[in-house]
Amino acid sequence: MTQPPASTSGIMGTLSSWNLKILQINQLHLVHWNAVKFENFEDAALEENGLAVIGVFLKISETSGSPVSTGRPKPLARKLRPAQKHWVLQSRPFLSSQVQENCKVTYFHRKHWVRIRPLRTTPPSWDYTRICIQREMVPARIRVLREMVPEAWRCFPNRLPLLSNIRPDFSKAPLAYVKRWLWTARHPHSLSAAW
């Protein structure tokens, strides 16, 4: 089996040739870069702290366990077509409906499972962020992934610290509520000073 790089200091390969049952922190291959500053992934990877691990694609079977019990099976994450490998993800404008249906990704917020969702619902704080999307989903154990998330967030350059362990489900929330929750989470002292 081909082994991934030992660290995130160089350009990472793809997961297409790997079939890993358990992933380590240096084996996550969903990375971001500043789409305004860099035109391509290679230039960003050569920058100091250019690679930032923020998540991993999963292939969830209908019988697999989930840290959040919803009483119904999780859907299978679909594989991406080659033409969908790279996208500029922004809160606005939303991606086309075809992309929303065919691109599924699992996000993590600290130690909490968020859910499999379309790319159009990427968190608003990730504006002007481009994500390198791998074509194949990776089976992994939830327990191992939950242990990797805090370390992965610390590798994320120039991000504000997470102030809450709980993230509400924004799938059906109005945009105004989402913005208010994000502002409140990042400015807790401003609210207390106002009272």
UniProtKB/Swiss-Prot annotation:
GO terms for molecular function: carbonate dehydratase activity. Substrate binds at T121, T122. InterPro entries: CA_dom, CA_dom_sf. Pfam families: Carb_anhydrase (PF00194). One of its GO terms (cellular component) is cytoplasm. Belongs to the alpha-carbonic anhydrase family. This is Putative inactive carbonic anhydrase 5B-like protein. The gene is CA5BP1.
